[in-house]
């Protein structure tokens, strides 16, 4: 890390600092309303989102593996954090966040960052779209100004609450929501350099204060005053009993945070022609999530939209991310008394737009049109995210993807019998020597097919079975088990297996399972011709 910063400082100039300063301020302006919105949607007071934005934002910029990454609370976390708050409470959310930070650090230390990239795209698109639907529909109540609603962890229960309380809709809330929605759609075309969410909050707050004060819920009426001071340091209640019940939620936060941050880093790489360090990024995210709860902040991760904005506004180094965090803190200290007047209804369109933008609509539609195994994985993951939980959806989605991949790989394995004439075997020995070429990995998805084909061959009762395995890169434990059965059955009928061209990796697998010794070292050959000559000589001698 010291080397990274020394290299950055070495070529740093005032011109670059001015660019980083501008980019950091612009991203900070965008981050402020989003941080409050995400916190409220997660079931906690808005200041906890702001604390997360500046603490995690600064730490990830210093310690992370991508020099353009902007971290903070994100929309993807909303359903997960809301579920934890409803089930365990805010204090336990801090504990779960800190535990997730430790897990992220361990993932980075043990270099799991490269493995996270192998999570199938249909799984990530499925749960991201599911989260988007949950966020969007979760804001309908605030958009309409419904009162008396209880929050639930279940999507269906929340939709039922909306239905039961539709008659409590507030005209002023709907009016404010519509004004903010219009601002979000119109202002980016008129003033693209100024963040539309900030303009929307300023305009709607001014309208509400001037024309109908006290007619609709505000941040102040719902959550009280926002402290205009630096957040106090407080260590969460990390007792064994507390941590043991929060292992599951912490793991979900860590996995989702790791995936989101690495996706954001990949986007930054594509925009800047740079290359991030996946494992260092996870460590940076981990440190941020360990420290942030000590200041009351909610879990954070890399934010794709804010990272892209940082780059588009001329950021040249990690300094822009640090400035973004400092700007958010200064804004909190100065503007907290004003922020309490922001209508809750003005937050709803901002979150709805976030949900719309994160839904990956085009990719979702493309995978649906494929009508393949990927389509099934996508639909199952999406539905489980909405109607069950993110934990269940990712587990089932990954399991289904692995099963379908194994099936596809298993069917792609080739087992081809070579005719004796083509192998130049003496005519009188044709029936006593069978030769098979095997292509593809011998793993659990292909092991049974391999066994079935070979068993058919040995029922003809050849004396020697030559397996050409030069194109077999790996043999897993399941395939070893089936191989044992083949060798055992063939030995019973007095036959001998000869193996040719075996790779070093596959050979180590057979040695570890004991198969290498059972078959006998003298029955392994580099070339098929050598195995044929061995079999012919043995048969001619009457062996």
Q: What residue ranges belong to the model's regions?
A:
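Transmembrane helical cores of multi-pass ion-transport proteins
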Residues: 1-413, 514
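Short, contiguous clusters of charged residues that form electrostatic/catalytic patches at enzyme active sites
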Residues: 23, 181, 185, 448, ...
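Conserved SAM-binding loop
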Residues: 70, 499, 524
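Generic hydrophobic alpha-helical segments
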Residues: 81, 162, 450-454, 531, ...
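Residues within alpha-helical segments
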Residues: 265, 269, 308, 507, ...
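Short secondary-structure capping/turn micro-motifs that flank functional sites
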Residues: 326, 506-507, 526
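The feature marks cytosolic C-terminal regulatory regions of anion transporters and related permeases
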Residues: 357-513, 517-518, 536, 542-543
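Short acidic-hydrophobic, aromatic-tinged amphipathic segments that line or gate anion-handling sites
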Residues: 518-534
